[in-house]
């Protein structure tokens, strides 16, 4: 079935919940546990370096910045190979390896800190980053296989929202774990939960509807028809030259880089800002630091639902829908960070509100540039995500280091103001580039002899006997 055929196709939509929803739930929790292990150091390091503790590590802020960024050293290295491996071997095995290895390293990290100090901690974090490099490419591959176009906005948002809930829960729980059982409990809890998820996903996860042991023929037909395919997808060689010379793809790269600069600046430095500038104790620090990510988690569902409605009712084209939500997701935080820069001294409520808005409204990116990889070339979505994530996470390394360079006195609000202004500027200009040059038109290099046509939602009718269903039954 060619993409060039613009006629709307009648699709049989199964009633009730299906296996695609179970896969969505599994990926949601996998993303949640992966992100708890990604960000646990941001809170743990506050307690690990607290002089009031009987045992603490006297690491200066520059060393702490190195530790916080070390995860991304490993994370960046394997991004492009991860995209190619996900496309070749499927997302399930890579996602499982990522979470299970991260869980083991999380369990070992407290011992590493006691034996080898910050150098061994960095080694553990680099190894965690190396294996988490598979998370986004494998998830994008799985999403491209499982999510029907008419449900893609909400279901994809649900999967990636697991990461934000993971951050929120981690920040919320870390303070209680550290004050009750010590900072080591943070890593032990993460490792145990991640290991339990890995076993569950090995049993119930699947790379595609065609490979699931539990799915009905009706649901397979629905997903296949919605995505414009029947049977297993062909695997074409990646057209690297065409990919890297595609201006719409570069618009996605730029947006992803801008997103990572602002997001990871706040994710890694917010607990320190709360502690040193707002004078918030560790337990309250965790609660207040979690609020922005809880708001992002909740708003992601609102924006995912709105995206599906807008696309289904054709109020905007798919291209303009992506641009609209990406603008909310990047320019909204830019405005909030400028507001945060002028926070009145000692006004903790104002600062928390601005941080909550800055992170919460960033949920727009999930139905913005994050879906354009799949729009442009569903056959190569894992490869595209690997490339953009590789480049964007170089930014994730640089951003905390730049913050460490700018902020010499952690208690001085004027130095943090510079950090927030830089992040706001990056948000603004990268989204401007995305708005000017991005598109959701499927690219001709996605499949041989295909024509560019913007992806359109097919009309969904009540279940009835279809030619595709008859064809399936004859197999």
Task: Please provide the spans of the model-predicted regions.
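Cytosolic juxtamembrane N-terminal segment immediately preceding the first transmembrane helix
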Residues: 1-45, 55-58
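C-terminal ends and interior cores of transmembrane alpha-helices
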Residues: 100-115, 327-345
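Cytoplasmic helix-loop-helix junction between adjacent transmembrane helices
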Residues: 121-164
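Extracytoplasmic gate region of multi-pass secondary transporters
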Residues: 41-42, 244-301, 363-370, 374, ...
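Conserved MFS/SLC helix-loop-helix module at the cytosolic interface between two early adjacent transmembrane helices
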Residues: 77-118
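Extracellular/periplasmic helix-loop-helix junction of adjacent transmembrane segments
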Residues: 44-77
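Central mid-sequence intracellular linker of multi-pass
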Residues: 154, 159, 178-245, 251, ...
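Glycine-rich segments within core transmembrane alpha-helices of 12-TM secondary carriers
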Residues: 135, 151-179, 185-197, 292-301, ...
């Amino acid at each position: 079935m060619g993409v060039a055929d613009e006629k709307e196709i009648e699709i049989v939509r199964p009633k009730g919940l299906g296996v695609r929803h179970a896969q969505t739930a599994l990926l949601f929790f996998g993303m949640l546990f992966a992100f708890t292990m990604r960000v646990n150091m941001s809170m743990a390091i506050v307690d690990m370096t607290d002089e009031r503790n009987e045992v603490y590590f006297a690491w200066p802020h520059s060393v702490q910045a190195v530790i916080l960024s070390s995860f991304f050293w490993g994370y960046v290295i394997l991004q492009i190979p991860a995209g190619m491996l996900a496309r070749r071997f499927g997302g399930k095995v890579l996602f499982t390896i990522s979470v299970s290895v991260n869980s083991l390293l999380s369990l070992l990290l407290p011992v590493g800190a006691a034996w080898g100090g910050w150098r061994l901690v960095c080694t553990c974090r680099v190894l965690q980053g190396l294996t988490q490099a598979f998370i986004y490419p494998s998830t994008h591959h799985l999403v491209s296989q499982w999510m029907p176009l008419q449900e893609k906005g909400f279901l994809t948002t649900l999967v990636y929202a697991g990461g934000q809930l993971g951050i929120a829960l981690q920040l919320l729980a870390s303070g209680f774990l550290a004050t009750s059982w010590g900072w080591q409990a943070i890593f032990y809890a993460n490792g145990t939960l991640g290991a339990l998820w890995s076993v569950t996903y090995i049993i119930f996860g699947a790379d595609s509807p065609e490979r699931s042991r539990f799915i009905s023929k009706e649901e397979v037909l629905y997903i296949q028809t919605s995505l414009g395919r029947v049977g297993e997808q062909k695997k074409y060689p990646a057209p690297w030259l065409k990919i890297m010379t595609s201006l719409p793809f570069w618009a996605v790269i730029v947006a992803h880089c801008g997103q990572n600069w602002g997001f990871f600046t706040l994710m890694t430095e917010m607990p320190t800002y709360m502690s040193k500038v707002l004078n918030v104790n560790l337990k309250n620090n965790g609660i207040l630091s979690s609020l922005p990510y809880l708001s992002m988690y909740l708003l992601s569902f609102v924006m995912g639902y709105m995206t599906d409605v807008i696309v289904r009712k054709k109020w905007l084209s798919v291209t303009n829908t992506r641009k609209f939500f990406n603008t909310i997701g990047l320019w909204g935080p830019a405005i909030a960070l400028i507001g945060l820069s002028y926070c009145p001294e000692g006004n903790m409520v104002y600062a928390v509100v601005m941080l909550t808005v800055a992170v919460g409204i960033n949920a727009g990116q999930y139905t913005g540039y994050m879906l354009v990889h799949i729009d442009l070339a569903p056959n190569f979505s894992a490869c595209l995500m690997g490339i953009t994530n590789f480049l964007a996470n170089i930014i994730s390394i640089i951003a905390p280091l730049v913050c460490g360079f700018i902020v010499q006195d952690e208690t001085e609000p004027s130095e943090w103001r510079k950090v927030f202004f830089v992040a706001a500027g990056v948000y603004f200009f990268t989204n401007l580039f995305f708005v000017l040059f991005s598109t959701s038109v499927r690219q001709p290099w996605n499949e041989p002899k295909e024509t560019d046509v913007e992806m359109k939602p097919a009309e969904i009718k009540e279940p009835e006997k279809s030619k595709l269903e008859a064809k399936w039954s004859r197999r």
